Amino acid sequence: YRKSLSLRKTKTDKVDAHTITSMIMSDVNLKSYSDTSYHNEELKSLTRYRFDKVKERAKLKSSVSRLVCILFPELEKLVPSLHMASVYALLTEFPSASDIASAHLTRLTHLLSQSSKGHYKKDTAFLFREAARSSIGSHMPAKSLELKHTIKLIRELDAEINEIENEIKIIINEINPPILTIPGISYRMGAMILAEIGDFNRFDSPDKILAYAGMSPSTYQSGQLDNCYAHMEKRGSRYLRDALYNATKYVCHWDPSFSSYLAQKRAEGKHYNVALSHAAKKLVRIIYAMEKSGQSYIPAR
């Protein structure tokens, strides 16, 4: 660029500064760095960081289920979920069936009552201990130690994820985007969608956003062969694709118009995932229109 401005072979700091300034001023498409750009970058970093942390926590929870199946397999049928504060408190102190079987009933009752905020009482403690005494679980100190450490790591991740979500909430409250007026979209899901899309002015149409998320149908044609059942491309931002699909599930649950639209596609004989992809495309069109106009969501009557 510098050589195109002059035939003279001059290289000084003053000339360089003038050249850089001229190049920047000549770019008509260049936009100044705004608060919106800053918020988008911050949101993208935070939401992707949270995504990775949640994924890491999910793996640890699978490890807990595996270890409980070895140490006290009957426990899973006694509680709504293994991943509850009361169950984690129990397994932290008594990680195996043999530990629970030999525990004092008073101590067991106090632990369960305190960790469940009074939900579990003496009868539950007695039930757990009796199940532990007749359990087929193995007594393996190494696995018990692994279970305690895994639960500790999950608790640490819970605290980290909560801290990340608080930072996300602060930024979202400053932006106050229209997307949050759609029933079923929380600040976490809305933040990830906004962060991954970024500036909506970069996209000429909602279809461009769908292509960016890898949600457009693939095309294959060779001679007389034409694909009748086009598969999704699944390219682009996997974070955006994941966020849009999860958001669509919740919106279809909470918004009557989306719920009926999903039911209509299912009635046409479409597979659930195919019907959900149609609802996701409809959601993207609505989000695009809302963000471009700045208007809140108006439910269909």
Q: Model-found features: residue ranges?
A:
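A detector of single, family-specific signature residues
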Residues: 1-301
